[in-house]
Amino acid sequence: MNNINYQYDTFCKQILARPIFLAHILKQCVSEFKQFDISVIAKDCIRDIHVNQKNIHRFSPFLSQFEDDSLKEGKAVFDIFFVARLPDSDSDIDFYINIEIQDDFYPGYPLSARGVYYGGRMLSMQYEDQIRHSNYGNLKKVYSIWICLNAPKEERGSITEISLDKKVHVGYNRIRKEDYDKLSVILLYLGKESEEEILGLLQTLLDETIQSERKLAILEEEYGIVMDDETRKTTIYKVKY
C-alpha cells in the first residue's frame, strides 16, 4: 500500500470509529443492541475506541488492543477495536468488538476464516481480564465485523452472520445459549445501492467519489446522522483528502 492509500485508509478508519457510526453498526448488525436508541448506544454503550494503535496494555480492566500478541500466538492487528456494554447492564464490559474495512476481497484466504480467527483472539485476550482463575463463565461475547468494499457482483448488498450453535445428537441437555454463544463474525458486502439502511450508510460514508457537502447532506437527511462538530470536520477532511 503506498503512502496516499495508507493515509486514506487511516482516514476511513478514523471516521468510522466515531461513536455515532459505531452505534449505527451495533444497532443494525448486533442483535443485542437492536432494541436500543442509537443516541443511547453512542453516548452510553461504547468505550475505549482505538484505531491502528499498538502496545496497549493487555491487562487493562477496560482492554482495547489492536495488535495482540498474547499467549505467544503471534500478532493479530485489528483496524478498530472497542468494548461495549448494554444500557441496562450491571457489567462494565459485555462485548469485545473488532471492525475491519477490507478492500481486497481475495487476499489469498477466506475472509470468513480470518474473521473466526480474529474472534478467537479476542476470546483468548480475555484470559487475564475476564477469566482469571478459570472463571470461564465470565467470558464476554466477541464480534468481528467485516466491511467488504469489493465483493463479487452477485454477493453485493448482503449481510451474513457466522456464529456458534449447538446440536444435540442424542438425548437432551440444559446447555444455555448464553453459555456458548460467545463468538460471531458479521460480513457486510458493499458495492451497490441497497434498501438495507446500514449498507447504504456505509456505502455513502466510505465512497471517496462523493463530495463532502453532498456526503454530509445524505448522511444527515437520508440516514438521520446527527454529527458533532468534530465528526463533521473529520468527515469533511477525509472527503477532501
What are the residue ranges of the model-derived segments?
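Elongated, amphipathic alpha-helical interaction scaffolds
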Residues: 1-241
